[in-house]
Amino acid sequence: MQAYTYISKGKFELVEKPKPVLMHERDAIVKVTLASICSSDLHIKHGSVPRAVPGITVGHEMVGIVEEVGSAVTHVKPGDRVTVNVETFCGECFFCKNGYVNNCTDENGGWALGCRIDGGQAEYVRVPFADQGLNKIPDGVTDRQALFVGDVLATGYWASRISEITEKDTVLIIGAGPTGICTLLCVMLKKPKRIIVCEKDENRVRFIKEHYPDVYTVSPEECLEYVQKNSDHGGADVVLEVAGASATFRLAWECARPNAIVTVVALYDEAQTLPLPDMYGKNLTFKTGGVDGCDCEETLRLIAEGKIDTEPLVTHTYPLSRIEDAYELFENKKDGVIKVAVEC
């Protein structure tokens, strides 16, 4: 089968690999129908994910059809259309039992697919712990509608959930890339008083204004002053940092009011500075870390009910044979791209 593979730092390549086989009774083999490219794939390419293993098939955003299951799998069966969770987790360790599946202690737990084991930018993928890592797609939901459930939408849902948003809050979201928009969709479910999105890319700002006209937008240069003027207590009650740029972490805590919550969703290429003397007295609560993909069944239900719609994010579609072109487009943010669907 064809599989897009991490060769070395800076180099991915479409290569021929054997079709995966069941390796454990809790595995499933999924025929990938649709995959996508995530900014985390670019972090692997650039060498920013030290645990990524050269030689693995990349990709952790995908949907498909179950082809084969191990003897211990009971949640799904061959023929089921499924989303694939970016997190593989055992469901049995301390962290899994407490809902922190990103920190699963099993060797195949956490972010394994497309990082430490073969992922889904390929024709087939083996999914460990299939009962936890696969979710059936409701009959009325298309593959394109479900494509982001296992990763960027799960990230946005997790981030909005832990941010303790209320209907009285002013919420600032920094970054309107794919994860930022998915975070926005999930924040909107909380119905805060106002939502401000900080973004510098004109195409993304235009996308926000077109699809979410009640959301305020502002550039990074004007963000601090704008948030202070358009909030009730001199800053945002909740800030979600989804950009991961060199200056956005500082911007996040600067825009937060005293005693606010700052949720760091972004993955950074470089170390960030936490200048405690500068922020002394703000009494901020920081929440950080990777997505805990416990809510995929819930987000699929919300999609089926029409309460979440991520399909507008799919701006381009490529076949697997042209995945290098898809990466070139996505990495360089050409042609107004938000997300690329890859037909496998």
Question: What are the functions of these language-model segments?
Answer:
Residues S163-I165, M188, V205-T285:
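Glycine-rich cofactor phosphate-binding loops and adjacent beta1-alpha1 units
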Residues M1, K200, E225-Y226, R250-E254, ...:
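C-terminal hydrophobic helical "lid"/dimerization subdomain
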Residues E199, A266, G290:
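Conserved acidic E/D residue at the C-terminus of a beta-strand in Rossmann-like folds
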Residues K136-E221:
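Mid-domain Rossmann-like dinucleotide-binding core that forms the NAD(H)/NADP(H) cofactor-binding site
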Residues E92-I174:
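NAD(P)H dinucleotide-binding glycine-rich loop of Rossmann-like/cofactor-binding domains
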Residues H75-P78, E167, P258:
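Short, flexible surface segments
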Residues L34, N85, L240-V242, C344:
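Short, well-ordered coil/turn residues at beta-beta hairpins
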Residues P20-A35, S48-K97, P138-V141:
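Glycine-rich beta-strand-centered segment in the early N-terminal region that forms part
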